[in-house]
Regions:
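Oligomerization/assembly interface segments of phage tail-like spikes and tubes
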Residues: 78-96, 151-166
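Small/polar-rich, solvent-exposed N-terminal microdomains that initiate assembly or binding
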Residues: 1-77, 127-131
Length: 170
């Protein structure tokens, strides 16, 4: 499984339990504990990757792989460490369902961010997918806002670093 697919698998498989935990603790409202559409930006499928109709989903997370760095920590170069940098774009529309609630979009965005951060931090010491693909460490980095008030679109860009250690070289 490639790295972006592994990250999407991690998010999808751990979303519901972490959302439930945040609702139970009172950190987010149950109305904002929705399951987002997680999209690999490289996909060519219709309404995924290239153009996404945000009205179809309560929230969207678009995953980008920014870079990969390889280190050879031994004198013999027989193993390598890999570090991957990702950007996750969280997108939420402030729509008509909000009624008179002027903070609906901001509250939904905050809830999605808190769930995503909890998912990633809960697996900070590693995640293994069903096919054996694995990250040994995950680090949530910076967050920046990415809003478009004219389109009623709220968003965050979240950086993430994932590491794999001691991969043998054939």
């Amino acid at each position: 499984m490639d790295e972006v697919s592994l990250l999407i698998d991690l998010i999808n498989n751990n979303w519901s339990s972490n959302a439930t935990a945040l609702v139970s603790s009172g950190d987010i409202s149950a109305s904002h504990a929705v399951v987002p559409e997680v999209i690999d930006i490289r996909t060519t499928a219709a309404n995924k990757g290239v153009r996404v109709d945000l009205n179809q989903y309560p929230a969207t997370i678009v995953v980008f792989e920014d870079s990969q760095n390889i280190e050879y920590p031994t004198v013999h170069y027989d193993v390598r460490h890999e570090t991957y940098s990702f950007t996750l774009h969280i997108r939420v529309l402030h729509d008509e369902r909000s009624g008179l609630d002027a903070d609906y979009g901001k509250d939904r965005l905050r809830a999605i961010y808190l769930i995503l951060r909890r998912v990633l931090e809960s697996k900070r010491t590693g995640y293994t997918a069903s096919d054996g693909s694995r990250f040994q460490q995950l680090f949530v980095g910076s967050r920046s806002e990415s809003n478009d008030r004219a389109k009623r679109l709220f968003g965050y860009k979240v950086s993430l670093e994932a590491k794999r250690f001691a991969l043998s070289i054939p």
